[in-house]
Amino acid sequence: MKTASGYASAIKAATSLYADGMQTLTALWEVHTACRINPQGIAASLSMNNLYLETVTEFIRTYRALKNVIAKGGEGNMLNGAERTQMLWNLTNNLERLNRKLRLLSVSVTMHSLDDVWNRAITGKINKSNKVLAKESSKRMCRAISNVAKFYRYRQTHKPWGQ
């Protein structure tokens, strides 16, 4: 950080790190809200995709990067500006990936229901007419629209983190 560009790069990394941290808190709040609006979506989305495993993996990766940044501090482990900035950028990238996974998880929990699990289980085993398929599709679309409306209505009345 001996040059102006090194100092500016460090400030930019720290600023984006703070913004990503706030986005992570907001994304966690969105997952919580999705679970409140559609509790059956938790169990339904578990079998529909592997987002839970991917999200846990991103949490662990981000925790390790954060632990590495914190462990490298102190007088015994002095880092130069380039190393410090590189660690902050790595942490920022990990937080961005974590935020993306959390947002995908909240959408998955909001949209999926046990009807989707049942339909996936019986796919190809029971012949359905076009009329039945159209009714199920319409019902699924109405449910998704209703859940999204509930989600945004809840978000408007309970804004996270002072927004």
Go through each PLM region and give its residues.
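N-terminal Sec/ER secretory leader and immediately downstream segment
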Residues: 1-35
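Extended amphipathic alpha-helical interaction segments
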Residues: 21-108
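Long amphipathic all-alpha helical oligomerization modules
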Residues: 70-163
